[in-house]
Amino acid sequence: MDPKLGRMAASLLAVLLLLLERGMFSSPSPPPALLEKVFQYIDLHQDEFVQTLKEWVAIESDSVQPVPRFRQELFRMMAVAADTLQRLGARVASVDMGPQQLPDGQSLPIPPVILAELGSDPTKGTVCFYGHLDVQPADRGDGWLTDPYVLTEVDGKLYGRGATDNKGPVLAWINAVSAFRALEQDLPVNIKFIIEGMEEAGSVALEELVEKEKDRFFSGVDYIVISDNLWISQRKPAITYGTRGNSYFMVEVKCRDQDFHSGTFGGILHEPMADLVALLGSLVDSSGHILVPGIYDEVVPLTEEEINTYKAIHLDLEEYRNSSRVEKFLFDTKEEILMHLWRYPSLSIHGIEGAFDEPGTKTVIPGRVIGKFSIRLVPHMNVSAVEKQVTRHLEDVFSKRNSSNKMVVSMTLGLHPWIANIDDTQYLAAKRAIRTVFGTEPDMIRDGSTIPIAKMFQEIVHKSVVLIPLGAVDDGEHSQNEKINRWNYIEGTKLFAAFFLEMAQLH
């Protein structure tokens, strides 16, 4: 049998079986004939969808390295996306975001944010999709097995920078829209897009734009969808209802600006590095428990219902450990690992600026060093309170050393955690769409990382926000050999199409 016909038959069978099963659900079913046509279209055109992803991955839209060449690529990427949406019939505005001021005093233009609209039927609900088209730095010499900017398919895996974070999911949503358009079918819901090009650099100036547009562009929005994270397994889909926040700290210890010769001064100084190592060592113990007094005060007590949520999640610990390439985790059970990723704060030490870190030997005593660490915050933790607790703790530890050096603590980043109500109607619609496409219940997960835009939308726009990831846990976003599986990309396109139909049932 032709492989395409086989995929079509499998999709049709899954749809028919699941539509028969749907009598147990409270919401009406989407039109089965339309769903079948859309799925067939997506299967038949999947090679075209992969080709478009290849074209988008080829644009080196790196927002992290503030150099003119990459900034030009970012502008090109946003122009390509705007043109794609216009060809679908969307009303598109590319909003000028002004300049980005760099630490060295220079400035670079910020790529425009795309605000696009498809449909304005007052009888339909309006769903707004957020995505970003900038990527982390990538270089073949960093350990990539393929050119990071040439999408390469190996055993069903599509390797390339941005394939899963976030160009693939953005295109999956666009592909779902294009399927309805190609079949000359009305979109089940009104759709809006907000697409940026600076997420990897901290979404520069985006919050100001969202605030400015809350009573215009966002005024008719009923629901917001983000697809910018991963499943917790390789094969089972998930819905994300919470993320951790992030407080990033720097602690500077200084004797003088110049380094010292260890033969001349070793043994007669309060060495800044020794002070700093003691400070960093006071933050967290060998079991991962944070030693800062008061840090756990706002962490909500664990409930039986929450424990049952963790038990229901599919997580193969051996698979997870192998895909992570670590010998052992701090905890031995699925439930403990999930809780310490999602519902408890964590503290990570990232590096020391000013220390000798090159090959060879260099017998200097650094005159000034800066330690860098961050705390991932969980819901109900307060960023300002954490800043005070950390500063107070480090000052207390430093005072006991009786050092003549100077210590300065600063929090350079303070991003809030986010959590949503999983009984919200949008979440129930997403669950039904996942059942239709994948034939299984989704894992209801949180994300241990930080996605500031979710909290931003929740606080400014005051609408339901859901994260619907498409990529597998081993996609390697931000790392070498980032990929998205062809299966995830294509089935994710179907998921968004089914989601449109489910959301239509809410109005």
From Swiss-Prot:
Domain of life, per lineage: Eukaryota
Keyword tags: Carboxypeptidase, Glycoprotein, Hydrolase, Metal-binding, Metalloprotease, Phosphoprotein, Protease, Secreted, Signal, Zinc
Binding site for Zn(2+) 2: H132, D165, D228
Annotated EC: 3.4.13.20
Biological process terms in GO annotation: proteolysis; regulation of protein metabolic process
Glycosylation: residue positions: N322, N382
Cofactor note: Binds 2 Zn(2+) ions per subunit.
GO molecular function, one term: metal ion binding
Protein residues bound to Zn(2+) 1: D165, E200, H478
pH dependence: Optimum pH is 8.5.
InterPro entries assigned: ArgE/DapE_CS (IPR001261), CNDP/DUG1 (IPR017153), Cyt/Met_Dipeptidase (IPR051458), Peptidase_M20 (IPR002933), Peptidase_M20_dimer (IPR011650)
Gene Ontology CC: one annotated term: cytosol
Phenotype for D165A: Loss of activity
Active site: residue positions: D134, E199 (proton acceptor)
Signal sequence segment: 1-26
Cofactor dependency: Zn(2+)
Localization: Secreted
Keyword Secreted: yes
CDD domains: M20_dipept_like_CNDP
Chief localization: secreted
Expression across tissues: Found in serum and adult nervous central system. Absent in serum from patients with homocarnosinosis.
Protein family according to the UniProt entry: Belongs to the peptidase M20A family.
Name under which the protein is recorded: Beta-Ala-His dipeptidase
Organism: Homo sapiens
